[in-house]
């Protein structure tokens, strides 16, 4: 992660299991497990179940966050995994999520956040 403060993965997950995506407790558990399996330190967890369907949530980790917004009726989930530092690989967390949500297809991209090679920092 040279010259960057963090790595932010954006994932479009298609063909996911609708029953899983609509279960707030299960989505929360999978998200927390993904963070822990990647070696992250979980700080806060907040999830909400929408009516008639859908779940949104965030797992705040010491290294940044994991977020999700689900559309069970479409079998779709929008997932973000953002990690700072070099101790947690966001792809490990994402692989866990994709597997446990049963995604048939994903489109993912990684953005390097806080690219500092041209930044000038003045501390007074």
Language model: regions and residue ranges:
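Polybasic/polar functional segments that serve as interface/processing modules
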Residues: 1-124
């Amino acid at each position: 992660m040279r010259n960057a403060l963090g790595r932010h993965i954006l994932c479009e997950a298609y063909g996911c299991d609708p029953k899983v995506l609509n279960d707030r407790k299960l989505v929360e558990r999978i998200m927390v497990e993904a963070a822990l399996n990647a070696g992250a330190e979980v700080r806060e967890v907040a999830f909400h179940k929408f009516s008639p369907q859908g779940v949104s949530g965030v797992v705040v980790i010491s290294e940044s966050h994991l977020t999700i917004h689900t559309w069970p009726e479409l079998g779709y989930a929008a997932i973000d995994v953002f990690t700072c530092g070099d101790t947690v690989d966001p792809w490990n967390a994402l692989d866990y999520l994709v597997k446990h949500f049963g995604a048939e297809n994903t489109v993912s991209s990684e953005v390097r956040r806080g690219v500092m090679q041209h930044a000038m920092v003045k501390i007074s």
